[in-house]
Regions:
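N-terminal [4Fe-4S]-dependent radical SAM core
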Residues: 1-25, 29-47, 60-67
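Generic domain-boundary/flexible-linker signal
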Residues: 16, 34, 43-46, 82, ...
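Short glycine-enriched, charge-decorated loop/helix-capping segments at active-site entrances
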Residues: 39-43, 141-147, 215-223
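Short, conserved loop/turn and helix-capping segments at secondary-structure boundaries
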Residues: 48, 145-148, 225-228
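Conserved AdoMet/S-adenosylmethionine-binding subsite of the radical SAM
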Residues: 59-63, 67-70, 75, 79-201, ...
Length: 248
C-alpha cells in the first residue's frame, strides 16, 4: 500500500520520546487558524511512498534513536491515511521500532469499519501525541472549522484502553489563552488516567510565508506570540510539571 507523504525529518527531538524519525503525511480536514503547515492540507499534493520504503528510509537513522526513540507519524492529519498507518506500524513493530502518532483526532469515529481499523492501529502504536485545540465546542469550530466532540470521545477511548498520551496545547493570544478555558482544559485532563505529559506550545507566526506562497489569507498575521508570563501562567493552570513522562 502507498501513502501520500509531505516530507521526512530525520532527527526530531520534540515529537515523542527520544530522537525520532518524523514522517509528515499529507491531508488534513481541519483548517486551524494557527496552522503553520497549510502546504500539508491537500493529500494528493504529497509524494507517494510504500510503507516498506518509508520504513527503509526511517531505519537508516536508527543508530540515532537510542533506547527511547523511534518513528513518529505526523501531518497533516495521519489518521486520514489509517490503512497506510496500520501497514507501516505493523512493519515497524516487526523490527522492534517504537511507534508514535501525532494527531488532532479529527477523523475519529466509533462507527465501523473505521473504528475496527483504529483498534487494529492501536495494537501497533506505542504513544499518541494529541492536541487539545480548544476545550469549548463553539470555539473549537471557530478555530478549526470542525467539531471537537469526536475528539473528546477519542480521548475517552484511549483512556479506556490505557494507551499512553502526550497532550499539547497551542497557546494563542486571544483565542486559546483564556484562563477560564485553560481551567476547563485542566479539569478535563484530570479525568484521564493515561496522560504522561502535558506541554504548552507558544503560538508563532513562522508559517505566514507559506500562506502567502499559496495565495491564502493568514488571519492571525497581526497576532503576537504569547508573553513569557502568559506561557508560565498556562503551564501552571494545566499543571504541566505534574506530568513527568518522557522528560528524563
Amino acid at each position: 500500500m502507498k501513502g501520500y507523504v509531505h516530507q521526512f525529518e530525520s532527527f526530531g527531538c520534540a515529537d515523542g520520546p527520544g530522537s525520532r524519525f518524523i514522517v509528515f503525511l499529507s491531508g488534513c480536514g481541519m483548517r486551524c487558524k494557527f496552522c503553520h503547515n497549510p502546504d500539508t492540507w491537500k493529500m494528493k499534493d504529497g509524494k507517494e511512498y510504500s510503507a516498506e520504503d518509508v520504513l527503509k528510509e526511517a531505519l537508516t537513522c536508527r543508530s540515532y534513536w537510542g533506547k527511547k526513540g523511534g518513528i513518529t507519524v505526523s501531518g497533516g492529519e495521519p489518521l486520514l491515511q489509517i490503512d497506510f498507518l496500520i501497514e507501516l506500524f505493523s512493519l515497524a513493530k516487526e523490527k522492534g521500532v517504537n511507534t508514535c502518532i501525532d494527531t488532532a483526532g479529527g477523523p475519529f469515529t466509533m462507527e465501523n469499519p473505521w473504528f475496527e481499523k483504529f483498534k487494529k492501529l492501536m495494537e501497533v502504536t506505542d504513544i499518541l501525541l494529541m492536541d487539545i485545540k480548544h476545550i469549548d465546542e463553539t470555539e473549537h469550530i471557530k478555530l478549526t472549522g470542525l467539531s471537537g466532540k469526536n475528539i473528546i470521545q477519542m480521548f475517552r477511548y484511549l483512556d479506556e484502553i490505557k494507551k499512553p498520551i502526550w497532550i499539547r496545547h497551542v497557546l494563542t493570544p486571544g483565542i486559546t489563552d483564556n484562563d477560564e478555558y485553560l481551567t476547563k482544559t485542566r479539569d478535563f485532563i484530570r479525568t484521564l488516567s493515561n496522560v504522561k505529559r502535558v506541554e504548552i506550545l507558544p503560538y508563532h507566526g513562522l508559517g505566514a510565508i507559506k500562506y502567502k506562497d499559496l495565495g491564502l489569507d493568514y488571519v492571525l498575521k497581526n497576532t503576537p506570540s504569547p508573553s513569557e508570563e502568559r506561557v508560565k501562567n498556562a503551564k501552571e493552570i494545566l499543571e504541566c510539571e505534574k506530568y513527568t513522562g518522557w522528560k528524563d
